[in-house]
Amino acid sequence: KFLSARNSALNNAYMTGQFLSSHDEDGFKASLINGKGYTEDEATSAALVAATLQLTAKGIPVIYYGEEVGLSGLNNYPYQTNRYDMDFSKATKDNVTYQHYKNLLSIRNAYTDVFARGSRTVVAGSDEEGYDVVSRSYGGTTLYVGMNIKDTAKEVKVPVSLAAGTEVKDLYSGATYTVGSDKTVAVTIPAAKDGGTVILTEVKKTKDPGKTDPTPEKVSATLITLDKKTAGKQQNDTKKAAPKSGDDNEAATYVCLLGLAMVAITAATYRKKRACN
């Protein structure tokens, strides 16, 4: 409820940034490990889902450097382990956190208006089972964002405003689903350690490039036939209408003189106005 109310309150008069970590407070993962007794793996899993919530919410997502590769530290003066040197060697294909951020940022970039301006409505969820699904809608486009904080995958039914039989795609994993007769989509939200995220969108149907419209072909054939019948006549007409070289020179001279006359008239008018002033 809080996030839905926040979403409704934010508009283009606000410059609101949401962040999980900063230079003067404990990092998100570090705070879970040191304050709540999470293991490193548990904190990493929670951070993945938190990043999904952050990057799919209205507002400006602020990523504290290193967060995207799994770095975190404490605001423990004078050591300040939250102000670490950036470790670029962690930005690899094998780094789950890094790939998670790349995937989410790519999706947010593709649907900027939906995430920056869209409405937010909770459509499914369970505190006990640890998952939540919200719809983000703007300009005729609706995305369904599912998040799972548990260490096991969740099979859930997501109510959608789409017709039965419509194909939907999970932008996060690439998996496709079909809307059931009850206008729900049965999806699997992965465990938190695997990203804990699904982002569903309708698959728009496009025209089969292998099929052609017969009407344009028929029209083209008719035009070609007409062109063959009248080709000789058109050639003769063109020859008759073609001007002689002398006519070309006269026409060019006339256009040139007309242009000079217009310039002279404009200049005279300008001088007259200045004289009157």
What would you call each of these model-derived segments?
Residues 123-162, 201:
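Carbohydrate-binding surface patches
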Residues 141-143, 180-216, 224:
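C-terminal beta-strand-rich structural cap/linker in extracellular carbohydrate-active enzymes
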Residues 207-248:
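C-terminal low-complexity, Ser/Thr- and acidic/Pro-rich disordered "stalk" regions positioned immediately N-terminal
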Residues 1-77, 119, 127, 148-149:
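Conserved alpha/beta catalytic core and glycan-binding cleft of carbohydrate-active enzymes
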Residues 262-277:
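C-terminal membrane-anchoring or membrane-association module
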